[in-house]
């Protein structure tokens, strides 16, 4: 209810890091036939940066790391230039955990979706969760990571919003909970 999405679009995880990993790896593996190019910013949380490096080094994806301006916001002109027909996913955090910059997510989503509506957009909203009113459907993102401890819940609880139209593959195997995704 807090995110204003359907219950079936919420996948509970062990925290923001697992949510980010599931979004990036699960999406990349499920959509690799459509393209092998991923985009993120150069100042993401290590859960994003390390996962992008893994996908680049171990699974053969090409990753573009967007530069930021003097205020720590992604350069939208660089995002426009980075998009190509091989791009399948863009991931940008909502609020930076070190410098506090709030990213222009709505504008970035518009740029991406105007280029190709099939490119998926993920937001790591862990730092902004509970502080900003972030509604994934309203801003047009396909996946969004959150963490319970940012809203006074215990550590070790997180969630990933995945729009019901998004194809994703599991990264943990053996259980059948949450539609075999986790």
Where are these regions (language model features)?
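Pyridoxal 5′-phosphate
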Residues: 1-182
């Amino acid at each position: 209810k807090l995110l204003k999405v359907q219950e079936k679009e919420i996948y509970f995880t062990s925290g923001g890091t697992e949510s980010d990993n599931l979004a990036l790896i699960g999406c990349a593996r499920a959509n690799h036939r459509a393209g092998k190019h991923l985009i993120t910013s150069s100042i993401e949380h290590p859960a994003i940066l390390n996962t992008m490096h893994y996908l680049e080094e171990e699974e053969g994806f090409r990753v573009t790391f967007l530069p930021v301006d003097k205020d720590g916001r992604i350069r939208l002109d660089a995002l426009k230039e980075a998009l190509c027909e091989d791009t399948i996913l863009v991931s940008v955090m909502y609020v930076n955990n070190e410098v506090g910059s709030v990213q222009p997510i709505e504008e970035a989503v518009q740029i991406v979706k105007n280029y190709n509506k099939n490119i998926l957009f993920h937001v790591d909203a862990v730092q902004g969760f509970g502080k900003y009113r972030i509604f994934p459907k309203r801003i047009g993102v396909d996946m969004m990571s959150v963490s319970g401890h940012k809203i006074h819940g215990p550590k070790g609880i997180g969630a990933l919003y995945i729009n019901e139209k998004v194809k994703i593959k599991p990264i943990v195997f053996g259980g059948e909970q949450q539609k075999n995704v986790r």
